[in-house]
Amino acid sequence: MFRGAWMWPGKDAAALTICCCCCCWAPRPSDKPCADSERAQRWRLSLASLLFFTVLLADHLWLCAGARPRARELSSAMRPPWGAGRERQPVPPRAVLPLPPPPPGEPSAPPGTCGPRYSNLTKAAPAAGSRPVCGGVPEPTGLDAACTKLQSLQRLFEPTTPAPPLRPPDSLSRAPAEFPSAKKNLLKGHFRNFTLSFCDTYTVWDLLLGMDRPDSLDCSLDTLMGDLLAVVASPGSGAWEACSNCIEAYQRLDRHAQEKYDEFDLVLHKYLQAEEYSIRSCTKGCKAVYKAWLCSEYFSVTQQECQRWVPCKQYCLEVQTRCPFILPDNEEMVYGGLPGFICTGLLDTSPKRLETKCCDVQWVSCEAKKKKFKESEAPKTHQQQFHHSYFHHYHQQYHHYHPHHDPPGRVSNKPALLPVSGGSRLSPSRIRLCVLVLMLLHTVVSFSSNQGGGGLGLETLPALEEGLTREE
């Protein structure tokens, strides 16, 4: 046995070295509690710091990843996507005066031919499709057909009825001929079927009554009637030139109004869809009111076919009330100020400009659409309910800094709020986060104090392990 031990000196030396190292580096009873206590204190501080930063990072990622997609979801549900064409609501057919039927001896033209048509012209016209081409020229449609579909108008004037003398072209001072009111009513039934392309709430009849001199043209009813009689009397004389010139002038103003509306729509999309701006609101009602106000400015006439009328200047107040504030936000302060649209000239009572009346329209409320959207949603999870409560608090805070002003004539039961230029945001989620962090820190401090007071510490764990090893 001794011989074997001396034959392997390297192995014994290694065992002796390991034993010495363990004895040298083993903690002494005097300094072991101090070292373990210092090491445990460092671990506790590291754990507390790691826990604190983890909670802050989780809260930030939670708000960034959950709240903003939620806002985009609400925004996309409230407004149509950019680039999509605006859907026009179908206008209900208007009640028109019946046109006289064709003579009994004349057969009615079969469908698909080029005979005279007795219908409501453009309002009840069939959809664009296969239409017969008469004489090699496509049949005009829309507003252009108001002065070309003369088959029905030619029957309004019987050949036996003597026509009133027309106004000579060289005598401008002579008054135009007066026509009976019955024929004007039949002419009214014809022009009430045609509306503008963009400002589709205005008929040609409304424009002829209230705006009879567009671009210095004479578009009075007597002038149009006299020109129509001349066309009917001599079929080869040409088209209804006076009517065509007036319709073209109205169409130019309508296109100009549509260009201004497109510019306004572009501004709303630029500032309300960008990430660096805070406002997320329903702009559908704002656009509808702005369109109505814009058309009332370009066509200062009274709309004839309305159930109730309001002054057209009321549209301007609706735009100022419904359109949002276009103001930046830095996520710390909500800025207050004037609205993005301000009405001017409402107090102008000069007799030069007659006050026109427009239809009293019940505008669609954005709150009703939001309520319908919420009712159609699937049941929310706890996390979605938290994000919803956060944005509900944000919208309440926004309405606090930007109070809603009702137009004149409406009584609001809401209490008035004091104007505030700005205020800090402190959402309930951040309050709950601070309480959670304080509770965790209190737990760590309590655990540390229990260890320092002689409770069960980390230094007793190695002793327990040694006792179990000896028993085995």
Swiss-Prot record:
It comes from the Eukaryota. Glycans are attached at residues 120, 193. The chain crosses the membrane at residues 47-67, 433-453. It is a multi-pass membrane protein. Its main location: membrane. Keywords: Glycoprotein, Membrane, Transmembrane, Transmembrane helix. Disulfide bonds: none annotated. One of its GO terms (biological process) is calcium ion import across plasma membrane. Residues 90-110 have a biased composition (Pro residues). Residues 77-114 are annotated as: Disordered. It is found in: Membrane. InterPro entries: NALCN_aux_factor_1/2. One of its GO terms (cellular component) is plasma membrane. Belongs to the NALF family. Probable component of the NALCN channel complex, a channel that regulates the resting membrane potential and controls neuronal excitability. PANTHER family: NALCN CHANNEL AUXILIARY FACTOR 2, TRANSMEMBRANE PROTEIN FAM155. This is NALCN channel auxiliary factor 2. It comes from Homo sapiens.
